[in-house]
């Protein structure tokens, strides 16, 4: 089973058309990523003590079904790609509406940044298992290094 979190949607998630605003989907996906890090034993505030933090290069959202005001949603996280040194990663989030249908799929491409140097970084070895607890997507791939 993939890592997932159930949320009660809130009034501010919705737009004048009475469905969830597009940015709210991405906010919930981001929340799941951060909660996953804590679940894996590495809260972001602990990682930041080593001057490292997660960043995104891209975030692509595909909307499938509406989510209406008052619905509870489930948001999961799966690993869809990873490079050899685990410095770059891709995650896929599926957001399910209250009737269990996929309402959106969000694909993100991320990495780690050195918070002082403002350059891409590799996580210290003590975080090697951070992403190991995520299920892999069926189309999981290895990200080829651009350094070679």
Regions found by a protein language model. Give the residues of each.
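Conserved GNAT-family N-acetyltransferase fold
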Residues: 29, 93, 106
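Hydrophobic core residues within well-ordered beta-strands of beta-rich domains
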Residues: 3, 55-57, 73-75, 89, ...
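Hot-dog-fold acyl-thioester-processing enzymes
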Residues: 1-58, 114-148
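C-terminal edge beta-strand
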Residues: 8, 107-108
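Generic short beta-strand
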Residues: 11, 92-94, 110
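Residue-level signal for glycine
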Residues: 100-102
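Hydrophobic beta-sheet segments that form the core/acyl-binding groove
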Residues: 60-98
């Amino acid at each position: 089973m993939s890592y997932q979190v159930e949320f009660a949607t809130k009034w501010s998630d919705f737009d004048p058309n009475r469905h969830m605003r597009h940015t709210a989907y991405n906010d919930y996906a981001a929340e799941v990523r951060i909660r996953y890090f804590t679940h894996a034993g590495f809260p972001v505030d602990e990682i930041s003590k080593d001057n490292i933090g997660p960043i995104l290069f891209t975030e692509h959202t595909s909307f499938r079904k509406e989510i209406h005001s008052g619905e509870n949603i489930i948001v999961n996280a799966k690993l869809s790609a990873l490079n050899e040194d685990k410095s770059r990663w891709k995650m896929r989030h599926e957001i399910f509406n209250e009737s269990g249908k996929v309402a959106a799929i969000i694909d993100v491409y991320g990495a780690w940044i050195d918070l002082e140097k403002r350059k891409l970084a590799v996580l210290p070895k003590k975080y090697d298992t951070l992403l190991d607890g995520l299920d892999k997507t069926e189309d999981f791939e290895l990200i080829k290094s651009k350094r070679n």
